Design a protein with these regions (language model features):
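N-terminal beta-strand motif that seeds the catalytic metal site of vicinal oxygen chelate
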Residues: 1-20, 25-35, 100, 122-175, ...
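Structural motif
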Residues: 4, 39, 63-65, 96, ...
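Conserved beta-strand and immediately adjacent loop positions that scaffold enzyme active sites
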Residues: 6, 39, 109-110, 137, ...
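Vicinal oxygen chelate
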Residues: 11, 15-16, 24, 66-112, ...
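Conserved short beta-strand elements that form part of the metal-binding/catalytic scaffold
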Residues: 29-63, 121-123, 171-206, 251-256
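Generic structural signal for secondary-structure transition and capping sites
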Residues: 31, 47, 94-98, 236, ...
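N-terminal basic, Ser/Thr-rich segments that initiate or prime the first beta/alpha elements at protein or domain
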Residues: 115
Length: 282
C-alpha cells in the first residue's frame, strides 16, 4: 500500500548527505528519489522519509521523533533485535543522547538519541506478545505551550483522516510525573500509517516547528480542500501547500504528482505563490 503521509525533515543544506547517511545506516535503507540540491526521499525498512533542503532556521527538535520498534518478531528473535538496536544506537547518536541506553519501566532496552542532522530517534525493544506494529512510527510529544493536548489533537486527526483509528491509550495515574489522565502514550493510524503521541513527562521549552513536517499526498483537489480545511489554523503560515494546525504541527498538503508539477518551471512558479495548492490554476 502506498504511504500517504510522510514525515519530512528540514535539513540545513544537507538533504543529499542525510539521504546517503540514512541509506547506509539502516540495514534496509535506500535512496528512492532525489533532486540534487533540493530534496530526497529515502526508504527505511519500507517506510518513506523525506528530506528537504533549507536554512538553519527550522532545525528538527524532539517534539517530533521516530520510534524504532525492535520487535523480536521483526528481526528473527530477541538477540537479533537487541543487536540491531545497539548497532543503530551507536550510529544514530552522533548529535547527542537524550535518554541513555538501558532498561526502563516501559522497555527492557531503550534509548532516545539525536543524529548529526538533528533528527531524534527512540530505539525501543518491545514485547513480541503485544499488538504488532511497524518498525517506524512518527511520534508527537506535546510539551511547553502544547502540554496536555495529545488526546485532543489525536482525536481531531483521527476524525479528519481516512483509514484512521486509535490503538493503545495509556494515561498518567496518581503518583506519576504529570496530571492524572493526561496521555502517557497512545498510538493510532492516519491514512493507514501508524503514529504515536504523548504528553511530555517533563518541562520542555520547545514545541512543534517546520523542522519536521508531515506530507499529506492527495489524489485530487477535493482531497486537498478537505485536508487543508481540517488542518490549516494559522493563515500567515500558509505557503506553497504548507500549513500549520492549531497545535503548531506543520503539514504539507500536496498533490500526489508534486514532483512532476514542480519539474515545470512555469507551474513551479505558480505553486510558489500559492497558499493552498489550487490544481485548476496550474
Amino acid at each position: 500500500m502506498d504511504q500517504l503521509i510522510t514525515p519530512a525533515i528540514w535539513c540545513d543544506a544537507a538533504a543529499d548527505e542525510a539521504a546517503r547517511f540514512y541509506a547506509d545506516v539502516f540495514r534496509e535503507g535506500s535512496v528512492i528519489e532525489q533532486v540534487l540540491g533540493y530534496a530526497a526521499t529515502v526508504s527505511i525498512h519500507g517506510f518513506q522519509l523525506s528530506l528537504i533542503n533549507g536554512g538553519d532556521q527550522d532545525a528538527p527538535n524532539p517534539s517530533i521523533s521516530c520510534i524504532l520498534n525492535f520487535d523480536p518478531l521483526l528481526f528473527g528473535g530477541e538477540d537479533q533485535a537487541r543487536a540491531y538496536l545497539d548497532e543503530l544506537y551507536e550510529r544514530l547518536s552522533g548529535g547527542g543522547v537524550l535518554m541513555e541506553l538501558g532498561e526502563y519501566p516501559f522497555s527492557p532496552r531503550y534509548a532516545w538519541v539525536r543524529d548529526r542532522f538533528g533528527m531524534t530517534w527512540q530505539l525501543m525493544l518491545t514485547d513480541p506478545a503485544g499488538e504488532p506494529r511497524p518498525f517506524i512510527l512518527p511520534s508527537f510529544m506535546f510539551g511547553g505551550t502544547n502540554h496536555a493536548n495529545a488526546e485532543e489533537a489525536t482525536e481531531a486527526w483521527i476524525a479528519l483522516f481516512d483509514d484512521a483509528h486509535r490503538g493503545a491509550l495509556r494515561r498518567y495515574e496518581e503518583g506519576g510525573p504529570m496530571e492524572v489522565g493526561t496521555v502517557m502514550f497512545t498510538d493510532f493510524t492516519l491514512r493507514g500509517t501508524w503514529m504515536a503521541a504523548m504528553d511530555s513527562g517533563a518541562f520542555h521549552d520547545f514545541t512543534f516547528t517546520p523542522g519536521v513536517s508531515m506530507i499529506v499526498s492527495c489524489r485530487d483537489q477535493e482531497e486537498i480542500d478537505r485536508y487543508w480545511t481540517g488542518l490549516s489554523a494559522v493563515p500567515e503560515a500558509e505557503r506553497c501547500g504548507w500549513c500549520v494546525d492549531r497545535w503548531g504541527v506543520s503539514w504539507q498538503v500536496i498533490p500526489h504528482n508534486i514532483a512532476e508539477l514542480m519539474a515545470d518551471a512555469a507551474t513551479r512558479e505558480k505553486i510558489l505563490h500559492m497558499g493552498k495548492i489550487d490544481l485548476t490554476r496550474l
